[in-house]
Amino acid sequence: MLYRTVPKTGDRLSILGFGCMRYPSTRTGGIDEERTIRQIRQAIDGGVNYLDTAPVYHMGKSEVILGRALADGYREKVRIATKLPPWSVFDRDDMERILDTQLETLQTDHIDYYLLHSLSKSSFESMKMLGIFAFLDSAKKDGRIRHAGFSTHANNAVFREIVDSYDWDFCQIQYNYLDEKNQAGTDGLEYAAGKKMAVMIMEPLRGGNLAGRVPAAIQAIWDKAPVKRSPAEWALRWVWNHPEVTVVLSGMNDEAHIEENLRVADTALPGGLLEEDLATIHRARDEYWRLMKVGCTGCGYCMPCPAGVDIPGCFASYNTHALFPHDRTTKFHYIGQHGGLMGEKSSAGLCRQCGKCAKACPQHLPIPALMKDVAREMEGMMGVVVPVLKGGLWCMNKLGRVRRFVTGDKSHA
């Protein structure tokens, strides 16, 4: 296993991190807890020392199972990363309650890497008003958290604003060879690294879509390469090729995939790809773009939208759905990111057809017309799904307040 150093702390982290959002399931659809624990320990025994979870993953069960997996001496071998969900925070007491509950759930006295989860511009402004920086300072001072950071799918401008707002130790962004200009992108990666922040990467395989069953035209490119690698290995090596990257998270839930990722992480040095390797990846990237429904490059010239639509983000989800129609999670990711579930609503259905975006688009895309297509394809169930999921998150938060009441802290119940 190769390791990279967190600039501000000197902490040495495995370049491969274990993402705890996609645990293996049983035939009946529940989490296969025994297999999950075996897989987590398999990764740790192979050198992984960074594990990333969150309260919302598996509707609260991810942290519970991770805490159990880290018994028997495994906690001392790793760094735990988990997240504070802004959508469950309404006052400073909620911050305290959620963190203390996480410590109990994870069976630990401290969180090594603590993130504000999936920050958007509005959720970040709300958290600042509620005193998030004072909370982070206090939690670091009393030892409950060691390092503070954030994750985000926001555009580059918002990302830079968040980076500049606080003395963060690290951040977490989506990054892969299709997202060089999407969300924070390469510019954001380099900007954060220039601030001496560690950068953790999520979605290096775009939820697994850049691995496994890829379009035939893409597989043909990999097959013609002089070096034989799986689609997953090509994608992971591309991310690790960037020296600014600290950890790449993989939602590993298959023993063979864990072994493959561990093998690749033994040799994936920054700057290790040859020019012909990069040319092969660029051909695959260009073919993906050719296959996409919308030729959006994610440049952001169309933003901000007066109606609040995340135009590049909506197009990215729409293209992913077109490329990987077998992936049933794409629409749910769209709803989560743009349907108002974990931040302000930014879906295509908000488009007012004003045309401002089309005038600014360097690709000359008919954006208002395309927004109708995106809404038609991606938002059919949004009016039903979002209220249901929001209700679930509200119940999780309410249960926390009830727990606080029955344990005696009645002043905040």
What positions do the PLM features span?
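Structural motif
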Residues: 42, 46, 105-106, 166, ...
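N-terminal binding-site loop/beta-alpha segment at the start of enzyme catalytic domains
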Residues: 1-78, 141
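Conserved, mostly hydrophobic/aromatic
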Residues: 6, 18, 43, 51, ...
